[in-house]
């Protein structure tokens, strides 16, 4: 690559082409060195996340969508969360190919816009759905009696539909401002952003609404839940375990997306001219965004692994589904350390439901 080449090897990054932005023209002279061997390990990481995320999230969707009988509230959120992660990972092979080609996008302008739209929308949906799960846990633990009219399957489904509507709106700027941008030499193109003040400001606003705000809501809910758990009457062991699983999901999401979101905010401020940065810091920001993008993308395959590691009932059901067994194994496994006996159950199979006293949501 040329040393001053615009940069957009990943969908979470924007090209380092500052032409047309007042006060930032001097940054065009900054060198644009790539991470050593990034064209090797970044595609490999993306493809690994694609394989694990596709299998894991497709299994969760199959498990919950094919379940007969009434569905508990958290099942609705988990089903939509798995669908969002599934939509996210389906775009990863495209970005893996682009990364392997040094940022060159061989799939045309339409797929550039569509895949960018899918990433933005599913990322927003995931953040809002996790915030919805936190609010549901808050209502179940802290406001159990007062929240009964709100904690119904219809309200949960309406909340998820509202999340998807917001996610579609959040993805629209990608359809407008992202597309093929020329690489130096004019023969190849990359999938990147137009150098527009409007898009940078809009991206900052969306970052606030689709990451910072859900994060604040989540932290508030878990702080209140933590206070409630320390007061008598104490919450039962099953509910504590279900909270532990959901907290692990939330923590993984925040740990994966917080570095990316923070660096993206700095990047947008730099492009707006509000935060002038010297060339060494710009290069560090570029490398940091590349690494943070990889970390964020890996999150799309994390939730099924969390269910597998922390939920014994899910492990039994997964084994039954993989081996074609009848469910006798699931009946023999205690659900004391899973979500299944609490109202936050996600993966109780029908055999367990017939033999275990069900707890209300």
UniProtKB/Swiss-Prot annotation:
Pfam families per UniProt:
7tm_1
User: GO molecular function, one example?
Assistant: G protein-coupled receptor activity
One GO CC annotation:
plasma membrane
InterPro entries per the UniProt record, alphabetical:
CCR1-9-like, GPCR_Rhodpsn, GPCR_Rhodpsn_7TM
- According to the UniProt topology, which residue ranges lie Cytoplasmic? 61-75, 148-155, 221-242, 311-361
Q: Which organism is it from?
A: Homo sapiens
Q: Where in the cell is it found?
A: Cell membrane
What is the name attached to this protein's record?
Probable G-protein coupled receptor 25
Task: Please report which protein family the annotation says this sequence is part of.
Answer: Belongs to the G-protein coupled receptor 1 family.
- Looking at the UniProt entry, the stretches that span the membrane are 40-60, 76-96, 127-147, 156-176, 201-220, 243-263, 290-310
User: What the protein does?
Assistant: Orphan receptor.
Q: Which residues lie on this side of the membrane: Extracellular?
A: 1-39, 97-126, 177-200, 264-289
Record's bilayer topology term: Multi-pass membrane protein
Q: Does the keyword Acetylation apply?
A: no
Q: Which GO terms describe its biological process?
A: G protein-coupled receptor signaling pathway
Provide this UniProt record's keywords sorted from A to Z. Cell membrane, G-protein coupled receptor, Membrane, Receptor, Transducer, Transmembrane, Transmembrane helix
């Amino acid at each position: 690559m040329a040393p001053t080449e615009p940069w957009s090897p990943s969908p979470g990054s924007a090209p380092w082409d500052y032409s047309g932005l007042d006060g930032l023209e001097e940054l065009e002279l900054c060198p644009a060195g790539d991470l050593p061997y990034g064209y090797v390990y970044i595609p490999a990481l993306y493809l690994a996340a694609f394989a694990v995320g596709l299998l894991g999230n497709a299994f969760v969707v199959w498990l919950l969508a094919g379940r007969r009988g009434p569905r508990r509230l958290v099942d609705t959120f988990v089903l939509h969360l798995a669908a969002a992660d599934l939509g996210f990972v389906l775009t990863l092979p495209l970005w893996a190919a682009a990364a392997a080609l040094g940022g060159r996008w061989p799939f045309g302008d339409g797929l550039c816009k569509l895949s960018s739209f899918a990433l933005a929308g599913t990322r927003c949906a995931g953040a809002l759905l996790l915030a919805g799960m936190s609010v549901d846990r808050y209502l179940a633990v802290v406001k159990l009696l007062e929240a009964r009219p709100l904690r119904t399957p219809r309200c949960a489904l309406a909340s998820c539909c509202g999340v998807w509507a917001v996610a579609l709106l959040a993805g629209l700027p990608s359809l407008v401002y992202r597309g093929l941008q020329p690489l130096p030499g004019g023969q190849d193109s990359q999938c990147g952003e137009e150098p527009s003040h409007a898009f940078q400001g809009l991206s900052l606003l969306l970052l606030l609404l689709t990451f910072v705000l859900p994060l604040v809501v989540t932290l508030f809910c878990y702080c209140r839940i933590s206070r409630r758990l320390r007061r008598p009457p104490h919450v039962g062991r099953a509910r504590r375990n279900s909270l532990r699983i959901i907290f692990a999901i939330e923590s993984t999401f925040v740990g994966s997306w917080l570095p990316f979101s923070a660096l993206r905010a700095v990047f947008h401020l730099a492009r707006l001219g509000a935060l002038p940065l010297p060339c060494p810091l710009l290069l560090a920001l570029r490398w940091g965004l590349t690494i943070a993008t990889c970390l964020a993308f890996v999150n799309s395959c994390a939730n099924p692994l969390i269910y597998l590691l922390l939920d014994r009932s899910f492990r039994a059901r997964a084994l039954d589904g993989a081996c074609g067994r009848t469910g006798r194994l699931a009946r023999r496994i205690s659900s004391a350390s899973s979500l299944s006996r609490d109202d936050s159950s996600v993966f109780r199979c029908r055999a367990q439901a017939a033999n275990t006293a069900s707890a209300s949501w």
